[in-house]
Amino acid sequence: MAGIRIAISGVGNCASSLIQGLEYYKKISHSDNLVPGLMHNSLGGYLISDIKPVAAFDIDMRKVGTDLSKAIFSEPNCTKKFSDVPDLGVEVMKGQVLDGVAPHMTDYFRVDEKQKPVDVAAILKRTKADILINYLPVGSEEAVKYYASQALEAGCAFINCIPVFIASNKQWADKFRKARLPIIGDDIKSLVGATIVHRALTQMIVERGAKIDSTYQLNIGGNTDFRNMTDQARLKSKKISKTESVASQIPYDAYVYAGPNGCIDCLNDNKICHLKIDFKLFGDVPAYIDLKLSVEDSPNSAGVVVDAIRVAKIALDRKLGGPIIPASAYFMKHPPEQIHDAVAREKLEEFIKGTVQ
């Protein structure tokens, strides 16, 4: 079975955790033994060790021109190091800046205008990349569309991990469908993150016959993702993605708020979520759930992306194009179609086995 050749746009904390994870889990076999952090040891016959980075793009002068193994630990990245990564022989290349750097982030993302952007599609073709994984900052509307277009031009599948709506946008979905290239998106759900926990609790309350009156989810962190989202203009799509992901699980009108709420530098890549759900029980007796969740944000994301990569490769092998609905529904906050998580998981397993497309 051929390997999976991946390219990455945006070598930030999430990319760091993904690349570290490829090294950390490289000896995991086809065994069914539980491995912490993995939903599938083997997925469609593909192991973590089959995933090979072949190209990477960034705009920060501290990363451009360096080997990917070093760039993932360069500032402003601040996620935990859990694996040593050997030299990968993959040079980080300068991508197009476009709207990828918000005005308030110029001290955090350092652009050297003397470094010239490369032809991304040409690099993807030259390196024979199968899949382009998008990790650009939230709010990078034009930059994300640019990379999506480069994936199309190069004949790559596209995994969109941020809330710029590509897979869930009909025009873009049709472009990938017409090109017979798979896309999984939009906006990654973490393994055990705020959104998946919030969805699980709302699903349970609804199914048990209680009535949700209101619910909110507050999140703080200290990485560049949270710093970037202190600009309300960059935050719009993220709030839509998170709020709709939760609201879609409640089959009636209820007040729902979910979104990032501030950056505290000392937290680094630690994200702290506080969520509350007010609901009524038998006899309209009120009750509430008040919960705190603390996670290292980027490894939590990478645990899902390693499966999204393998599903995208299966879709490529089957010559499927357009949004892969079961994967998008299970892995992403803002898929083209919202599906109950338990149902989405069943459909995903059927897709992996090849019983549904």
Question: Over which residues does each language-model region extend?
Answer:
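N-terminal glycine-/serine-/threonine-rich beta1-alpha1-beta2 phosphate-ribose binding loop
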Residues: 1-147, 229, 234-238, 282
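A short glycine/serine-rich beta->alpha loop
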Residues: 3-5, 184-187, 291-296
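Active-site-lining helix/loop region of Rossmann-like oxidoreductase modules
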Residues: 9, 49, 63, 71-77, ...
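Gly/Ser/Thr-rich loops at beta-strand to alpha-helix junctions
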Residues: 10-16, 137-142, 162-168, 189-195, ...
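Short catalytic-loop micro-motif centered on adjacent basic/acidic residues
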Residues: 132-134, 158-161, 184-187, 214-215
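Rossmann-fold NAD(P)-binding glycine/threonine-rich loop
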Residues: 137-153, 161-182
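Rossmann-fold dehydrogenase core element
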Residues: 175-188, 209, 213
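NAD(P)-dependent Rossmann-like dehydrogenase/reductase catalytic/cofactor-binding core
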Residues: 303-357
